[in-house]
Amino acid sequence: MENFEIWVEKYRPRTLDEVVGQDEVIQRLKGYVERKNIPHLLFSGPPGTGKTATAIALARDLFGENWRDNFIEMNASDERGIDVVRHKIKEFARTAPIGGAPFKIIFLDEADALTADAQAALRRTMEMYSKSCRFILSCNYVSRIIEPIQSRCAVFRFKPVPKEAMKKRLLEICEKEGVKITEDGLEALIYISGGDFRKAINALQGAAAIGEVVDADTIYQITATARPEEMTELIQTALKGNFMEARELLDRLMVEYGMSGEDIVAQLFREIISMPIKDSLKVQLIDKLGEVDFRLTEGANERIQLDAYLAYLSTLAKK
C-alpha cells in the first residue's frame, strides 16, 4: 500500500447505483430521486450494511455537487439527550435550503440511541419543519424507535450483504489496490464479516498491510477469529464427553487468536446453528449458551463460565 487512505472511505458509494447488496432498497429510493422528493425515511438493519452510505448517496443524487450545503449528519449515540434535538437539529432545520434545493436533509445515525423524551421531541420537530426539511433516521433495531416516529417514516430494512455481492466488490477492491488474495482468504473475509461489509473491507486492508498475499490464516489472525472447523471441533469434542481435551482446544483458541469470552460465545452460537445435529439438541446448547452470555455481560469470570459450558456439553454424552 502506497498511501494511508482508509479503504472504507475510499470505496464508499458515491451514488445509489454503487451501493452493494441492497437492490430492493435502492430501487425504491431511485423512485424518490426521479420525483425529486422524499418522505421522512427510517433505515434499519445490522451494522455495515450500507445505511449511512445510502443516505449520503441519496443526498448526492438529489442535490448534485452542492449536496453538502443541504445535508447534515449527526450521530445520536454521541448525544442521547433532548438537547441535541432542541438545539442542533432545530438550528439546521429552521434555515432555508441553499441553491434552489426544495428541502434539506438531516441524517440522524443510530437514532435508536436517543432517549424516549428525545424521540418525542424529535417527532414534534419533524412535524414542525416538514415543509423545508426531511429526516433520514438510521437504527440497528427498529423496535427501539417510538411508534409515532415509525408511522411518519417510510421504513427501509437493510439486510446483511449477500455473499456473492460482497465477494464481487472485494475482488474489485483487491484489483484496484494491487492486492493478491487466495480463494480461502476471500472465503475467510466473507465468514468473519457476517454480512458486515465495513468489517470485511477493514479486515482486507489490515491483512494487505502485513503480507504480500492475503490468505485465510492472516484474516483469522488479525480479526481474532477462530476457523469455523476449529470451533466445530471444540463443540463435537465436548459432546463426545472428552472434557479435558475440549478444554485444551479452548486454551489454544484463546491464546492463539487472543479471543475474549464474548468472542468465543458469539462464534459458538454461529457454529451451533449451522451444525448438522437435531434441532432439540441445538435448543439445549443455545439455551445454555444464552445463560453463559448473560453471566459474562454481568461481569462473571469468562474462563470459569466457558469451562462450565464445556462441562455441560460433556455431561450430555452420558445421557
From Swiss-Prot:
Q: Per the similarity annotation, which family is this?
A: Belongs to the activator 1 small subunits family. RfcS subfamily.
Which cysteines form disulfides? none
GO terms (BP aspect): DNA repair; DNA-templated DNA replication
The cross-references to PANTHER family, in alphabetical order and at most eight, read: REPLICATION FACTOR C / DNA POLYMERASE III GAMMA-TAU SUBUNIT, REPLICATION FACTOR C SUBUNIT 4
Keyword terms, alphabetized: ATP-binding, DNA replication, Nucleotide-binding
Instruction: Please give the Gene Ontology molecular function terms for this protein.
Output: ATP binding; ATP hydrolysis activity; DNA binding; DNA clamp loader activity
- Would the keyword Nucleotide-binding turn up in this protein's UniProt record? yes
Subunit comment for this entry? Heteropentamer composed of four small subunits (RfcS) and one large subunit (RfcL). Both subunits interact with PCNA.
Question: What does the protein in this record do?
Answer: Part of the RFC clamp loader complex which loads the PCNA sliding clamp onto DNA. The complex possesses DNA-dependent ATPase activity which is further stimulated by PCNA.
- SUPFAM superfamilies in alphabetical order: P-loop containing nucleoside triphosphate hydrolases, post-AAA+ oligomerization domain-like
**Superkingdom of this protein's organism:** Archaea
This chain belongs to the protein called: Replication factor C small subunit
InterPro entries assigned: AAA+_ATPase, ATPase_AAA_core, DNA_pol3_clamp-load_cplx_C, DNA_Rep/Repair_Clamp_Loader, P-loop_NTPase, Rep_factor-C_ssu_arc, Rep_factorC_C, RFC_lid
Q: Where does ATP bind?
A: 45-52
An example Gene Ontology CC term for this record: DNA replication factor C complex
Q: Where is the signal peptide?
A: none
Kindly give the Pfam families that the UniProt entry links to this protein. AAA, AAA_lid_RFC1, Rep_fac_C
